[in-house]
UniProtKB/Swiss-Prot annotation:
GO terms for molecular function: arginine binding; DNA binding; DNA-binding transcription factor activity. Gene3D superfamilies: 3.30.1360.40, Winged helix-like DNA-binding domain superfamily/Winged helix DNA-binding domain. This is Arginine repressor. Regulates arginine biosynthesis genes. The keyword Phosphoprotein does not apply. Belongs to the ArgR family. GO terms for biological process: L-arginine biosynthetic process; protein complex oligomerization; regulation of arginine biosynthetic process. It comes from Actinobacillus pleuropneumoniae serotype 3 (strain JL03). PANTHER family: ARGININE REPRESSOR (PTHR34471:SF1). InterPro entries: Arg_repress, Arg_repress_C, Arg_repress_C_sf, Arg_repress_DNA-bd, WH-like_DNA-bd_sf, WH_DNA-bd_sf.
Amino acid sequence: MEKLDKLSEAFKALLKQEKFGSQSEIVTALQELGFENINQSKVSRMLSKFGAVRTRNTKMEMVYQLPAELGVPTTSSPLKNLVVDIDHNDVLIVVKTSPGAAQLIARLLDSMGKSGGILGTIAGDDTIFITPTKVTPVEVLMQNVTELFESSF
């Protein structure tokens, strides 16, 4: 296992203990596990990367914790696992995704461009608005987008 993979696994294992209330406590714990070159800024980046949040544990202490949801999506995640729902009205399509996946999927949709019938997208954390081009009926684009996510693995 690569050193970075070992660090990631150790980091996640520490957060699952739900006892670290500060980044400096995480730094100290990782250093005790043999990761000498770890510092607060690296821990901060890892907390963001893994979607960790501060929440109260069973003892009512504020601690860092990994989300219970799917976690942060990666480019290797199957797209159909990231899309929760697709719906439309007369003018646009709304795609609901797992938390954190909307911008990744919107980027893919934007790459289809006008030739794919997409004028543009707007993405939040878990929602994407898709506007069709003038020449593409929203129902046709809805079908194309749905097929895209059903056929991707």
